[in-house]
Curated annotation (Swiss-Prot):
Binds 1 divalent metal cation per subunit. GO terms for molecular function: 2-C-methyl-D-erythritol 2,4-cyclodiphosphate synthase activity; metal ion binding. InterPro entries: MECDP_synthase, MECDP_synthase_CS, MECDP_synthase_sf. It holds the Pfam family YgbB. It catalyses: 4-CDP-2-C-methyl-D-erythritol 2-phosphate = 2-C-methyl-D-erythritol 2,4-cyclic diphosphate + CMP. Involved in the biosynthesis of isopentenyl diphosphate (IPP) and dimethylallyl diphosphate (DMAPP), two major building blocks of isoprenoid compounds. Catalyzes the conversion of 4-diphosphocytidyl-2-C-methyl-D-erythritol 2-phosphate (CDP-ME2P) to 2-C-methyl-D-erythritol 2,4-cyclodiphosphate (ME-CPP) with a corresponding release of cytidine 5-monophosphate (CMP). GO terms for biological process: isopentenyl diphosphate biosynthetic process, methylerythritol 4-phosphate pathway; terpenoid biosynthetic process. It comes from Yersinia pestis. The keyword Manganese does not apply. Its cofactor is a divalent metal cation. This is 2-C-methyl-D-erythritol 2,4-cyclodiphosphate synthase. Its EC number is 4.6.1.12. The lineage of its organism: Bacteria, Pseudomonadati, Pseudomonadota, Gammaproteobacteria, Enterobacterales.
């Protein structure tokens, strides 16, 4: 068994700055997150947690923001590629727990589809995926509505033992 932790944060752009994508879901909101890729903090944190658990570095090492190939990249594709490397190393997902930290917009209506997307991308059952959201009670940059943060914890199991 191996445990990994991931964290990501992106700040909001101006009104009309693009789509807000979290957990692979387009969420109606007046602002998008600024990023080299699509800015999906949930998938970035999950990808970092997976890579960390397998000692494969981090999302910035695998998909550097200095590489134009990843400009505007779909984070679901990045997650799938990272997971392909996890499988090649002899591990599979045990479970994934994600916490989205945002004052707005409300995430609860979108969490079921986020779980579906993650289970599909990680080739697992939805019972292996948990996504929850919280606020910081209007404290800090997320509380002021300046951006969104996300943490993820993952358990990998050896394919031969799992």
């Amino acid at each position: 068994m191996r445990i990994g932790h991931g964290f990501d944060v992106h700040k909001f752009g101006e009104n009309g700055s693009g789509p807000l994508i979290i957990g692979g879901v387009r969420i109606p909101y007046e602002k998008g997150l600024l990023a080299h890729s699509d800015g999906d903090v949930a998938l970035h944190a999950a990808t970092d947690a997976l890579l960390g658990a397998a000692a494969l570095g981090d999302i910035g090492k695998l998909f550097p923001d200095t590489d134009p190939a990843f400009k505007g990249a779909d984070s679901r594709g990045l997650l799938r590629e990272a997971y392909r490397r996890i499988l090649a190393k002899g591990y599979k997902l045990g479970n994934l727990d994600i916490t989205i930290i945002a004052q707005a917009p409300k995430m609860a209506p979108h969490i079921p589809q986020m779980r579906v997307n993650l289970a599909e991308d990680l080739q697992c059952h939805m019972d292996d995926i948990n996504v929850k959201a919280t606020t910081t009670e209007q404290l800090g940059f997320t509380g002021r509505g300046e951006g969104i943060a996300c943490e993820a914890v993952v358990l990998l199991v050896n394919v031969e033992q799992g």
